[in-house]
Amino acid sequence: MAPDTCCCSATALRRRLPVLAWVPDYSLQWLRLDFIAGLSVGLTVIPQALAYAEVAGLPPQYGLYSAFMGCFVYFFLGTSRDVTLGPTAIMSLLVSFYTFREPAYAVLLAFLSGCIQLAMGLLHLGFLLDFISCPVIKGFTSAASITIGFGQIKNLLGLQKIPRQFFLQVYHTFLHIGETRVGDAVLGLASMLLLLVLKCMREHMPPPHPEMPLAVKFSRGLVWTVTTARNALVVSSAALIAYAFEVTGSHPFVLTGKIAEGLPPVRIPPFSVTRDNKTISFSEMVQDMGAGLAVVPLMGLLESIAVAKSFASQNNYRIDANQELLAIGLTNVLGSLVSSYPVTGSFGRTAVNAQTGVCTPAGGLVTGALVLLSLNYLTSLFSYIPKSALAAVIITAVTPLFDVKIFRSLWRVQRLDLLPLCVTFLLSFWEIQYGILAGSLVSLLILLHSVARPKTQVSEGQIFVLQPASGLYFPAIDALREAITNRALEASPPRSAVLECTHISSVDYTVIVGLGELLEDFQKKGVALAFVGLQVPVLRTLLAADLKGFRYFTTLEEAEKFLQQEPGTEPNSIHEDAVPEQRSSLLKSPSGP
């Protein structure tokens, strides 16, 4: 085998298995930092996983089932050292909406979402995510933060029999507010206050420096440990308090209850399910999930790619977006074999990972191992965790998702983008897919309007000059013809015109036909239309079209000088052999400009 072939094969293998790129350089220093980061993330993900299972409407163990597979898959396939895959608030909300509190539906949704994500990665379809704009994403996540947060008020206050639909939830929560359990309310609010205080301490902790006294370094390390593991600390403390009351025969808190012990069995996803003595087939399950088969994989990819790009930019490295699609897709497919529901990249846990100095995705191995150990040995203790404490964890986790700044920023910068933001935000309270679909449609209409009606710069005078400020595509050709016709041909008398094409990088057949008809209109009026600033690919295309009366000039001055010739002078059409020498040489270059 030729050396070049071996080199290409090795490069391709490293691209598909990024672990091969950094493992040869792995060091003991990296191992120490990765271990600390993995442990920190593990202490964060365990209480969050239990809490997010509640958001998803599933038994608590399903949160833990969903929390470890991504750690191992991303070790091999991930291109970001910071990202951690697992259950998130947004994904849990979507799962709740599309799986009807049925674990079988949730696991099948993970499998099908993973297949779709894998296909997108293999076919390099990641660019499709670019059509969901930032205002749409912000509108959805802001609405989701309110939906998720308010949905936990019932657990925070110990209320029972509250519906899950948002508007009914709001109504019944206020209707039954008098049934608040004092124990749950006190514990929940105290847990939330403690979490907020610890988070504030973490954010305002002074950076370390070599000249710190040993006692100060130790104190800082202790505070850093407590604030980083604040979720685990608060949930563990609440569980101890609840256990103390339980052994005395008092029951002031609503507890999580019995959790299935042990590791999840490895089995294929359920392609049918029996409910109320009726077997629901695979096709019926797919039909029941409906739009979720598009919304869940797309939102999972968006959330994960957004997290990866954010931390890659912050920490000065690059990610491979299509490789990230493969990583998250395979995570969901393999996760479905161990009863996981759909997962994605977690911003909060990724931030913990980055702040603790993680060096490689190997930190995920520690996190995954910690989750497996907790499943195997600690599930009996998790049953004493009060639901109000988990509600406090969720509410403090989703509060930052509500982005007030985006509303102010768009008002100052681009008010039109407030339209898709508000449409998505408001409709997401009604139906999630309607919010995302309507917001994306509004964004697309705004984009199409700018394509169909590009802004132009106009210079009036004896010769009319028009310059499109952006590209020229087929939806815009009629508007362009109308603008030139109204200003030049319908003037009294008709006057010649120049089309300045500096910003036009390509033209399609419809544009060529429209320009040909425009040239004929100018000839009928006895005036001329000249083209200036054509890029080489566009010039090639127009010359190949052999448009009658086509004239091209290098500069605007040349065009104006030509068009201002004495009446009766017949100008010569410019063909490829008459193009200025510099341009002609470019035309002959197969590589373009």
Curated annotation (Swiss-Prot):
Tagged with keyword Membrane: yes
Bilayer-spanning residue ranges: 35-55, 57-77, 83-100, 107-127, 177-197, 234-254, 288-308, 325-345, 362-382, 384-404, 418-438
Disruption phenotype: Conditional knockout from Purkinje cells (PCs) induces a negative shift in the reversal potential of chloride as reflected in the GABAA-receptor evoked currents, indicating a decrease in intracellular chloride concentration. Both in vitro and in vivo, PCs show a significantly increased action potential firing frequency of simple spikes. At the behavioral level, mice show deficits in locomotor activity.
Keywords: Anion exchange, Cell membrane, Ion transport, Lysosome, Membrane, Transmembrane, Transmembrane helix, Transport
Tissue specificity statement from the Swiss-Prot or TrEMBL entry: Abundantly expressed in the cerebellum, with a predominant expression in Purkinje cells (at protein level).
CDD domains: STAS_SulP_like_sulfate_transporter
A Gene Ontology cellular-component term: endoplasmic reticulum
Residue ranges with Polar residues bias: 582-593
Domain called STAS: residue spans: 453-566
Subcellular location: Cell membrane; Lysosome membrane; Apical cell membrane; Basolateral cell membrane
GO biological process: oxalate transport; sulfate transmembrane transport
Family listed: Belongs to the SLC26A/SulP transporter (TC 2.A.53) family.
Entry-linked PANTHER family: SULFATE TRANSPORTER (PTHR11814)
Descriptive protein name: Sodium-independent sulfate anion transporter
Organism of derivation: Mus musculus
Taxon lineage: Eukaryota, Metazoa, Chordata, Craniata, Vertebrata
Gene: Slc26a11
